[in-house]
Regions:
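Sec-dependent bacterial lipoprotein signal peptides
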Residues: 1-21
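Short cysteine-rich clusters marking metal-coordination/redox-active sites
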Residues: 83, 104-105
Length: 131
């Protein structure tokens, strides 16, 4: 009986971390706007998207503009430039940092991965809004 209790306790102890993990919070307060854009990789400023790892901004789309990131030869990521921490804050706008691998909001200090939009650091807990 003691052996069974030990096994049960050990199993529960090992499974606890698995079930306690949660996905990043999704910002349900981020404004939802329709997006329907076409870009041409032969037209400036989108020509920089011909190289993997580069990004380009699209003005007048999304809530605060969109950043497009070239992940691979046939895969792109598109995110809103509004900071998920407080998307309606005046002056809040995500800008690419010097590495070109992350976006930072100068107002709140949150930093996000351009590859997948996840939070790197800062007060934000929700990832960048993806399109």
């Amino acid at each position: 009986m003691k052996s069974f209790t030990k096994i049960l306790f050990s199993t529960l102890l090992l499974l606890a971390p698995i079930f306690s993990c949660k996905k990043s919070d999704v910002n349900k307060n981020f404004p939802t706007v329709p997006v329907n854009i076409t870009i041409y990789l032969t037209t400036y400023p989108y020509t920089q998207l011909n190289s993997i790892g580069n990004h380009a901004y699209v003005s007048n789309a999304g809530y605060r503009g969109i950043v497009i990131y070239r992940k691979s030869l046939d895969e792109f990521a598109a995110f809103d430039r509004g900071c998920p921490y407080d998307p309606t804050a005046t002056g809040s706008l995500l800008e690419a940092d010097g590495s070109g691998l992350a976006m930072t909001d100068a107002k709140c200090g949150s930093k996000f991965s351009l590859y997948d939009g996840t939070v790197i650091n800062g007060p934000a807990t929700a990832p960048m809004k993806s399109y």
